[in-house]
Amino acid sequence: MKKLLLILLCLPIIGFGQQTYVPDDNFENYLEANGMGNGIANDDYVTTASINTINTLNVNNMNIASLVGIEGFIGLKYLYCGLNQLTSLDLSNNINLENLHCPENTIATIDFSNSVSIMHVNCENNQIYSLDISQNSLLGHLELKDNNLFYLNLKNGANTLLNHMRVTDNPNLTCISVDDSLWATNNWNVFQDIDPQQYFSNNCSTTGIEELSTNKKILKVTDLLGRETKQTNQPLFYIYDDGAVEKKIVIE
């Protein structure tokens, strides 16, 4: 009976004390200064209960290099994180996200595929090389100007809702997968939304992909969603130590 009572007394403490790991000092300091921390400066943690109901987060121009910990913001709808030093952005746990603004970083990999309610995305001036929005059928605004795109899949079954789409200044991007190539050509070209070498297709081929020189060190291999993988027989991105990205398929 005493053991049972002790367990019951500890449960509220355990629930209240759940922590989220936030390794970036500038990100943690912002959360601490704005009532979203655990009261302990520079310990790399914040109290989960203080962030999981936050609706809007604005960390623009905070010199942040990592947003690890953003997964604890499960109620987040609006995220503003532009003008930082982010190299990747994993929003796979932020399923309620509706608006994302992350321009002027050096983001190479990004994942908001689980954010099925997302409507507005601005990721211009980054290094994103692959993006698949096939699960984001409510998207109405997509800004990807000045990135490093090799692959872009806009085939989400609702392209007519995407009334603003811009992917200019992506010299490595040629074929863009869409629901209806004729509709896309007639609607998205009008406002010079794509580069001259880019075109829309219902079925972009994954064969005959341009291969770059491999006389350099491979840092990691990712799939089309930016996830590290060792699987073959699918389009993969090889990321090298000089910043180059090579796209190819290994058949086994």
Language-model segments: residues:
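The feature encodes a structural signal of leucine-rich repeats
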Residues: 67-71, 86-92, 107-113, 128-134, ...
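Conserved hydrophobic beta-strand positions in leucine-rich repeat
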Residues: 55-59, 79-81, 98-102, 119-123, ...
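N-terminal capping/linker segments that flank leucine-rich repeat
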Residues: 5-78, 95, 116, 153-160, ...
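C-terminal tail/sorting-segment detector
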Residues: 237-252
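Residue-level detector of functionally pivotal "anchor" positions at catalytic/ligand-binding pockets or at interdomain
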Residues: 201-229
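Consensus "Asn ladder" position of solenoid repeat domains
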Residues: 62, 84, 105, 126, ...
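Conserved hydrophobic position(s) of the canonical leucine-rich repeat
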Residues: 54, 76, 86, 97, ...
